[in-house]
Amino acid sequence: MALLVASMTLAAASAVAQEPVASSAIAIVVHKDTEVDNLSLHELRSIFLANQQFWSNRTRIILLVRAPKSEERDFVLNTIYQMDEAQFRQYWIAKMFRAEVPRGPKIVFSTDMTVELVVAIPGSISFINANEVTDDVKVVRIDGKLPTEEGYPLQ
């Protein structure tokens, strides 16, 4: 009996392992009129930390960030911000208290809401699962690579 269960478990695991795995890459998306096509990971981090607050054409950068408890937010906090949730909150409280920014990031609650706001707000930038990108937004290359390319840094 144990041998039968073990062989069924191995067969099921083998079948799962052969299924294609969805991309877990995070795409950085901007309003279509934003005059940026490529950012280094360092430049992206500077934007997300609000150290750079304007695009080259002097349009204010509007940062849209997913609400807590989303996989995309957790990934971005770890990879781009290099902070946990508590450090992220404290960072923005301190930044606003020192009057370094007029406001913190706008919070979005879904991919659909993210896309709708990026489309509607000139200068906006955000992140979504690369599998959910639509033609309504512009995907920014990071270090010269798109989310579908090997070596993309946000995977």
Regions found by a protein language model. Give the residues of each.
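Exported/periplasmic ABC-transporter solute-binding proteins
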Residues: 18-155
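Bacterial N-terminal signal peptides
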Residues: 1-11
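Sec/Tat signal peptide C-region and signal peptidase I cleavage site
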Residues: 13-17
